[in-house]
Amino acid sequence: MNFVTCHVQMRLLLQRRLVRLRESELFRPQTSLSTFKRHASQKTRPIQKCSRKYARILLLSVLVPYTGYAFYVSLATVKQIDLRNEMCQRLEENNNEVTYKGSLLKYSPLEVLGRFENPFEEYRIQTVFEFFANRVFELFERNRGGIPRDVHQMNKLMPVHKPTWGPNLVDVDPAEETALPLECKVLDELHIPTAVEENEGSKCPVYNTWLGQSCNYTVYNGLRILTDPLFSDFLIHKTLGPKRITQMPSQITEVPKPDIILVSHNHPDHLDLESLEYWSGKDSPLWIVPKGMKSYMTSNGCDNVLELSWWETLQVKKNNEIYHISATPAMHWSGRSLLDTNKSLWCSFLLTHHGNPILFHAGDTGYVKDLFVRIKERFGKGCKLALLPCGQYCPEWHQKPRHINPQEVLKIMKDLEARNVLGVHWGTFVLSGEYFLEPKEKLEMLAEWGGFKDRCYCPELGKTECFD
């Protein structure tokens, strides 16, 4: 009996130990798998270290040469500016006045290493570091631009009108229009007209319709001019990029066919792909662009293109009337990507008729203390209408070399002795830090303080205005 009991107890004990052993094996890490992971991690560590090393080398191989390039460009530009200032000062100190030759010496296009640079003392070169640093700062801004969420409130703040365009253009069907051919030729310096006394030609009214940003439709004496065309809801692509914050006053298909399209530079908010596609091919308007932009235009199907460099003048003849369009300097930059930065020039434009300044389109520019005085001395004072940008100036440390604020708009108005000024380049996209209505409010407040609020203000979208 004792033997049987002992045997049973021994079997029970062995069974319990066997069960415990099996349970422990269920939770015991697999030796082969853990060993494999350990060996795998040991193999990947050198690869990770190597990839980090190559990433650092690649980053340094880009940043170091670019920093050296930017440093060289800055030094070369400053050297050229000093040389030009010295030569201009010697030339003009005997005359005690601003001369056209001095303007050519001081403010002719400047190229460094195959790219255009600004020949202005007021300009500070923008590097890639600054550009992307400002983009990072923008990520932390809340409700940038102060855009109201309520659509009805936005419509009250930014009313949109249906354009009437100008005399006899309300009922015109753009699809049925055929543009009259223009006779054009670039003039040499000896044949460029200078300012003369007022005559019948300068008494024709100017009709202007602001379509957003720097896009304006201007009619003068039957000549139709479109500036910096922009008819897209997004800047970069049809569905990408900063979105338009206001309604478009007119679709591109509703715009009466212009005779001339002026493009101040190739930034996406001054030239969109939709305009290139719509006004290309045969019977397209005459595109007038800065030097270096023609190849981009032709690659997008626009063949009726003429390039102008600073101080060059194009003679245009329509209906036996002769007009002159001159490209004048501006302080800005160009580029639609990082690779083509400053490969083409940027400029402003001045339309003259019978030697009198009619329309000044600034495009984008910073303020230069004697530039606009020199433009006035060359082409005459009393410009009927100056279209000047007044937005995108915050933060000032970043924007000031390339954009003007409302105070500087008034300075340019005084320098040009312009009769009327419209503040544009605001209220269309959020591209800077100021409240979206601030440019309008500041400009009109300063103009009222100066006693000329009826001659200097911001237009309403789509509203066609007449300037005698």
UniProtKB/Swiss-Prot annotation:
Induction of synthesis: Expressed periodically during the glycolytic and respiratory oscillations cycles.
MF-aspect GO terms: N-acylphosphatidylethanolamine-specific phospholipase D activity; zinc ion binding
Keywords: Hydrolase, Lipid degradation, Lipid metabolism, Membrane, Metal-binding, Mitochondrion, Phospholipid degradation, Phospholipid metabolism, Transit peptide, Transmembrane, Transmembrane helix, Zinc
Annotated positions binding Zn(2+) 2: D269, H270, H425
GO BP: N-acylethanolamine metabolic process; N-acylphosphatidylethanolamine metabolic process; phospholipid catabolic process
Binding site for Zn(2+) 1: H265, H267, H332
One GO CC term on file: mitochondrial inner membrane
UniProt keyword Hydrolase present: yes
Comment on bound cofactor: Binds 1 or 2 zinc ions per subunit.
Membrane disposition: Single-pass membrane protein
Pfam families: Lactamase_B_2 (PF12706)
Transmembrane regions: 54-76
UniProt enzyme class: hydrolase
Predominant location: mitochondrion
Catalytic activity: an N-acyl-1,2-diacyl-sn-glycero-3-phosphoethanolamine + H2O = an N-acylethanolamine + a 1,2-diacyl-sn-glycero-3-phosphate + H(+)
Additional comment: Present with 178 molecules/cell in log phase SD medium.
Protein name: N-acyl-phosphatidylethanolamine-hydrolyzing phospholipase D, mitochondrial
Organism, as annotated: Saccharomyces cerevisiae (strain ATCC 204508 / S288c)
